[in-house]
A protein has these predicted regions:
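N-terminal amphipathic alpha-helix/helix-capping segment at the start of soluble metabolic enzymes
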Residues: 93-98, 122, 158
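Generic beta-sheet signal
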Residues: 46, 105-107, 137-138
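A short pocket-lining beta-strand/turn micro-motif at the edge of beta-sheets
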Residues: 82, 101, 131-135
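Active-site regions of enzymes building and remodeling cell-envelope glycoconjugates
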Residues: 100-103, 118
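Glycine-rich phosphate-binding active-site loops on the catalytic face of alpha/beta enzymes
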Residues: 11-23, 110, 117-149
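Catalytic-site microenvironment of enzymes
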Residues: 32, 36, 151-158
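Conserved anion-binding
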Residues: 1-84, 88-92, 100, 110-113
Length: 158
């Protein structure tokens, strides 16, 4: 919460992301601090990263599947008063049933683009169809001809 309070004089900060692994107590404190400090500041809870697969989640000690963990994290975001969550497109359908706030989706790839190091990717149109309210795009836009890639994105969305 001290970090949030330190942002009070900085203009044009709309979102702060916080990982769900921070735990309920920390998440609630951050949400409370954001409300006191800046009424426009929106807290987005980050769920399981798109670079993590079910096999790698087990290797780091989790016994539940990614789908189960993300559902728990969506309930946590709701219970703690978060404005939104960040989740992979592959998790959108189950999350949308639980969480009604903003849902930001990373790991977006245009048709034909490599997933690279990302394990759980989805196309932009499918992400919006499945409940995403905003996309995070990097490689599909900046690799190669940016102008051409933006045109590809627009075509995919139409």
């Amino acid at each position: 919460s001290a970090a949030i309070r330190s942002l009070k004089d900085i203009k044009n900060i709309n979102y702060i992301t916080l990982h769900a692994n921070a735990g309920e107590e920390t998440i609630k404190a951050v949400v409370k601090s954001a409300k006191k400090t800046n009424s426009k500041l929106r807290i987005l809870l980050v769920t399981i990263l798109t670079s993590i697969s079910n096999s790698s989640i087990k290797k780091i000690g989790h016994t539940k599947s990614i789908k189960e963990l993300v559902k728990k994290q969506a309930f946590l975001a709701k219970a703690c008063g978060c404005h939104g969550i960040v989740c992979a497109g592959t998790d959108l359908k189950s999350v949308k049933k639980i969480f009604k706030g903003e849902i930001v989706t990373p790991g977006i790839r245009l048709k034909g683009d490599s997933a690279g190091d990302q394990k759980r990717v989805i196309g932009p149109k499918e992400a919006f169809k499945n409940g995403s309210t905003a996309l995070v795009m990097g490689r599909s836009i900046i690799k190669g001809n940016i102008k051409n890639n933006i045109s590809r994105l627009i075509k995919e969305l139409n």
